């Protein structure tokens, strides 16, 4: 079994996350994808609580799973009483899937700081690292050969930050989110001024 792990704040999850999940299933041959909802203290938060972000991520998984069960939302990182590090998440996932091949899916922006992450060597031992680059012109520090690191071009102009900003300005984002998440955001009154 091949298990992919994608961590993020998912504040909110959007069609870019949906596309990445489907890409992982179809082109990386991932059998199971875990979307781990985390809390990044470096990221500005608007108004979505941990439980709301987890609920929206579960809605995203429901959308992804319409074509077959593949994706699970995970709140393990939110439940930790200490700062959560990727290496700890991967240890947890390894305990759930002891014989699986693990792939950590990371965005290009996160990859740039990979060397400063807690235990990057152990991360590479626990999982293949797949970096989703926004395109060759954006990936300025891509090493030609890094053991265990795979670079995949994945151009997606969406970001949760951009969506929160548009919602706060009263703009529609319905074409940029799964409809269930759009309805949830409107029902909960998230990201407004």
UniProtKB/Swiss-Prot annotation:
Q: In which pathway does it act?
A: Cofactor biosynthesis; NAD(+) biosynthesis; deamido-NAD(+) from nicotinate D-ribonucleotide: step 1/1
UniProt GO BP? NAD biosynthetic process
What is the top EC class of this enzyme, as a single word? transferase
User: Which CDD domains would you find in this protein's record?
Assistant: NMNAT (cd02165)
Q: Per UniProt, which keywords does this protein have?
A: ATP-binding, NAD, Nucleotide-binding, Nucleotidyltransferase, Pyridine nucleotide biosynthesis, Transferase
Q: What is the role of the protein in this entry?
A: Catalyzes the reversible adenylation of nicotinate mononucleotide (NaMN) to nicotinic acid adenine dinucleotide (NaAD).
Q: What would be one Pfam family of this protein?
A: CTP_transf_like
Catalysed reaction(s) here are: nicotinate beta-D-ribonucleotide + ATP + H(+) = deamido-NAD(+) + diphosphate
Enzyme nomenclature, EC number: 2.7.7.18
- Which SUPFAM superfamilies is this protein grouped with? Nucleotidylyl transferase
Q: In the record, what terms sit under GO molecular function?
A: ATP binding; nicotinate-nucleotide adenylyltransferase activity
InterPro entries, alphabetized = Cyt_trans-like, NadD/NMNAT, Rossmann-like_a/b/a_fold
Q: Which family does it belong to?
A: Belongs to the NadD family.
- Claim: Magnesium is one of the keywords in the record: no
The primary gene name is: nadD
Question: Is this entry keyworded Mitochondrion?
Answer: no
Taxonomic lineage is: Bacteria, Pseudomonadati, Chlorobiota, Chlorobiia, Chlorobiales
What Gene3D superfamilies would the database entry show? HUPs (3.40.50.620)
Under which name does UniProt file this protein? Answer: Probable nicotinate-nucleotide adenylyltransferase
Q: PANTHER family in the record, alphabetically?
A: NICOTINATE-NUCLEOTIDE ADENYLYLTRANSFERASE-RELATED, PHOSPHOPANTETHEINE ADENYLYLTRANSFERASE
């Amino acid at each position: 079994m091949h298990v992919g792990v994608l961590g993020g704040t998912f504040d909110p999850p959007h069609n870019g996350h949906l596309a990445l999940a489907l890409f992982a299933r179809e082109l990386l041959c991932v059998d199971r994808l875990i979307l781990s909802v985390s809390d990044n203290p470096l990221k500005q938060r608007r108004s979505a609580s941990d439980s709301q972000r987890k609920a929206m991520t579960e809605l995203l998984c429901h959308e992804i799973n319409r074509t077959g069960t593949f994706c699970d939302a995970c709140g393990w990182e939110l439940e930790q009483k200490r700062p959560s590090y990727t290496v700890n998440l991967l240890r947890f996932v390894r305990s759930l899937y002891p014989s699986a091949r693990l792939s950590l899916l990371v965005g290009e922006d996160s990859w740039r700081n990979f060397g400063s992450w807690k235990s990057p060597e152990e991360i590479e031992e626990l999982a293949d690292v797949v970096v989703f680059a926004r395109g060759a012109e954006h990936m300025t520090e891509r090493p030609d050969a890094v053991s265990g690191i795979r670079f995949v071009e994945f151009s997606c102009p969406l970001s949760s930050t951009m969506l929160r900003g548009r919602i706060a300005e009263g703009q529609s984002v319905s074409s940029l989110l799964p409809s269930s998440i759009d309805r949830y955001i409107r029902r909960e009154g998230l990201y407004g001024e």
